[in-house]
Amino acid sequence: MIVNVSSGMGSVAVTTDPGRFESTLIGLAYPASKTALNMITSQYAKAYPRMRINAVDPGYTATELNGHRGTKTVQEGAEVIVRMARLDASGPTGAFLDSEGSVPW
């Protein structure tokens, strides 16, 4: 079981959707690193099909990284991470998920 903590900022679809908050943000290193993590997740899931390897977006979580401006508590952000870490062998692999379901790549 591998749960990679990604972000909507790593999704080209999310960051180019004018209806999403993420489309208003400008960055280079953080979004690029999360996009790379998403590709690593996808490739590892294909290379190791017996493992559950997924990327999750905890949402805009109030942490030191954003000066505690996030709209979710750490407990709320951690929920999807913990849920995915508890998957059994029949759970998804190679997916990008948030608390509401699939996130577009």
Residues covered by each model-derived region:
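Generic preference for well-ordered secondary structure
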Residues: F21-T24, T61, V80
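C-terminal helical subdomain
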Residues: T35-N38, M51, A55-P58, G67-W105
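Catalytic loop of short-chain dehydrogenase/reductase
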Residues: M1-P49
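Conserved short-loop catalytic and cofactor-binding motifs
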Residues: L25-L28, L65, R69
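Short, flexible catalytic-loop segment of classical short-chain dehydrogenase/reductase
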Residues: S11, P58-E64
